[in-house]
Amino acid sequence: MKCKLIFAVFMLAFSMPSQAERIKDIANVQGVRNNQLIGYGLVVGLPGTGEKTNYTEQTFTTMLKNFGINLPENFRPKIKNVAVVAVHADMPAFIKPGQELDVTVSSLGEAKSLRGGTLLQTFLKGVDGNVYAIAQGSLVVSGFSADGLDGSKVIQNTPTVGRIPNGAIVERSVATPFSTGDYLTFNLRRSDFSTAQRMADAINDLLGPDMARPLDATSIQVSAPRDVSQRVSFLATLENIEVEPAEESAKVIVNSRTGTIVVGQNVKLLPAAVTHGGLTVTIAEATQVSQPNALANGQTTVTSNSTINATESDRRMFMFNPGTTLDELVRAVNLVGAAPSDVLAILEALKVAGALHGELIII
């Protein structure tokens, strides 16, 4: 049976000229970035959907000790409305103490659901071990789970992960190099020597010669005023300068799991003839039991009968002329009813043969 080829082909910027983009859309200012925060805490108030693990009990007991409540030795509290969780948040650059962050709360243990729970005060630390924010509040959980008495279970979305909008208060800000030094450095989101040079030229055309210089395919260094109050307006001017990015290199990206093929600009094929045969081998096992007569002095035996069938589908050969695009290749392969795996095999073979001009990336 022929397998219909199911995949998407996107031609990126076929013959369309590159459009100018603002610097803020293609580059970041070095040092101006988010910082990841993480913490370990307790969610309480769960309607019997919590967990009973050793580390949950230990964390709960430690919390009580911090409030001056000491439990007897070897006493194990029976709790089902508590869960230990990991709390994380992204701290934007320039955020100040007193401002709020959204936090995500994820169960670390066997809790069935965090719906209805409240996160108790949790310290959020940076990679340096310092506390930068404190999180607390009621969780918003979109998922839910329900268990039946017969063991059946219904789960929608993810009930063990929730969010607390504005659930953390910033206690300490993070220093950035924005206000120090004589230079500002921009880093391109997609490294390209041509784009880096064009960006430096565009800045120099506006501000004057030698104000900007490309350091490599990613970084462009710009002379900046030392006065911090002038840097904001200076950067506001820079980030709105329009630059025409260079054309992307020829690439073909194939997702081997979904069959999606993305074809970039300038991908070409040299003359080539392609044929791809499909050999299918089917092995069927049939187990038979031989049972002797009750009065006979024999033994029950089990035998296996194997049936092996091999079929090879008829595949056509197709030839490509100079300058053939991958779009035309995909259409030709579609006509012969190839599967996504067949297309991937053909692309790999063309690349090895040197007939595919472009980088083949398989994800």
Swiss-Prot record:
Subcellular location: Periplasm; Bacterial flagellum basal body
Keyword Lyase attached: no
Protein name: Flagellar P-ring protein
Keyword line: Bacterial flagellum, Periplasm, Signal
Signal sequence, renumbered to the chain: 1-20
One Gene Ontology term from the biological process aspect of the record: bacterial-type flagellum-dependent cell motility
Function: Assembles around the rod to form the L-ring and probably protects the motor/basal body from shearing forces during rotation.
Subunit structure: The basal body constitutes a major portion of the flagellar organelle and consists of four rings (L,P,S, and M) mounted on a central rod.
Any one annotated GO CC term: outer membrane-bounded periplasmic space
Keyword Signal: yes
GO molecular function: structural molecule activity
InterPro entries: Flag_FlgI
Family: Belongs to the FlgI family.
Pfam families registered for this protein in UniProt: FlgI (PF02119)
Location, primary (coarse class): periplasm
